[in-house]
Amino acid sequence: MINCKRIWAAITAAALCISLAGCGAASSSSAASSEAATVESAPASSAAAQEEAASPETAATGLRVAGLKGPTTMGLVNLMDSDDGANYTFTMYGAADEIVPLLVKGELDAAAVPANLAATLYQKTQGQVEVACINTLGVLYIVENGDTVQSVADLKGQTIVTTGKGTTPEYVLRYVLSQNGLDPDADVNIVYCSEATEALSQVQAGQATIAMLPQPFVTTALSQVEGLRVALDMNEEWQKVAGSQLVTGVLVVRKDAVEADPDAFEEFLNGYAASVEAANTDLEGTAALCETYGIVPKAALAQKALPECNIVFERGEQMKTDLVNYFQVLYDADPSSVGGAMPADDFYYGV
C-alpha cells in the first residue's frame, strides 16, 4: 500500500516550488477564485499526481479520493493526516477537469469537487456516480472599499467587478440581485475579469470600489487594501431569497465503489465528518495541515480564512434540499451548467 502521507509529500514538494511559495494575491487567489468558477489552473505537480492516481499499485489500495486546492478539500486534511488516512489514497489535482476522465474510467472512486461538476458527472456517466455529502457552502463575498453597501438594494447603480462569467459565480450574483428586485442588466454594472487578482487590482487602483470575490482570496485582499471590508456574505443573501444554503463543493463517489463495501464507505464518511469538525474547531492545526498538503499556500492565510470558508459535512435530506434548490437556479440560467438536466433522486446518497 502506498501511504497517503508519502503521496502528498511528493505532490507538496513540487507544488511549493512554484507560485504557491508566496502569499501574495496571485498565489492565494488561484485555488479559491477558480474553484468558485468550477475550473482551476493546473500546477506543475498535476501530471505526477494523475500518474500516481492511475498506477496499478495505487488502484489496489482502499478508496481512491481526489481533491482540489482550496475550500473543497480543506475539510479533508485532518482525515488525510490521521492514522485512518493511511487506509485511503488521496491525490490532489490542479484542475477539476483533470478529475473527470479518471472518475468516468473508474481510476478514481471519489472526489471533492464543485457541486455543479458532480451533477455534470452524473449525466456524463449515465447515473454511475452519486453525491455523498456537501463539504463547502458559499465562499463568495461582496467586498467594498467604502461604506455604501449595507444591503443588496444598495448595489443599485453600482459597478461590481468579479470573475466567472458564464459560470456559477455569475449565476449566483444574478439570482441574488434579481430576487432582491434588481435587474442585473439594467440596475447594476457587472464587469467580469479573467482572474480575481485582476478584479482586486481595479479596486486597488481606484477604478472600482466593489467586488465579488471568493475565499480564501478575500482574506488576502482585506490585508492588502486599506479600507476594504466585507459588505455582504453571499451565502447569507442566498439563504434569504432561496430558503436554502448556497453550495460550493461536494463529495461525489462512484456507485460501484460504494456497493463494493458499503460499511467501509460509511466508515470513511464518519472519518470525514470528524475531519470537518476538527477543521472548524482546531483552526491552527488544520491551517498547518493545509499548508503541508499544498491546499492553501500559507498556514497563516488558511487560519484566517477557515472560519469564512463555510466548511461543513451535510448529508441526507438537508443535503438534497440544498442541492436541488441550487441546481434549479443553475439549470434555469444555463442547463449545461448541471449537465443538461436536473439529477434524478438516485443521485443523492442515503436519501
Name the predicted role of every residue range.
Residues I2-A26:
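Sec-dependent N-terminal signal peptides of Gram-positive bacterial secreted proteins and lipoproteins
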Residues A37-A42, E51-D185, I190-Y192, T209, ...:
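Short, glycine-/small- and polar/acidic-enriched structural segments
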Residues G22-E35, V39:
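Bacterial lipoprotein signal-peptidase II cleavage site
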Residues V258-A333:
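Secondary-structure end/capping motifs
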Residues N78-L79, L140-Q150, Q245-A264, R315:
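A bilobed periplasmic-binding-protein/Venus flytrap-type ligand-binding module shared by bacterial periplasmic
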Residues D83, E236-S244, I311-K320:
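Short, solvent-exposed loop/beta-turn-alpha elements that line the ligand-binding surface or hinge
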Residues N116-L117, E198-C290:
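Pocket-lining segment of extracytoplasmic ligand-binding domains
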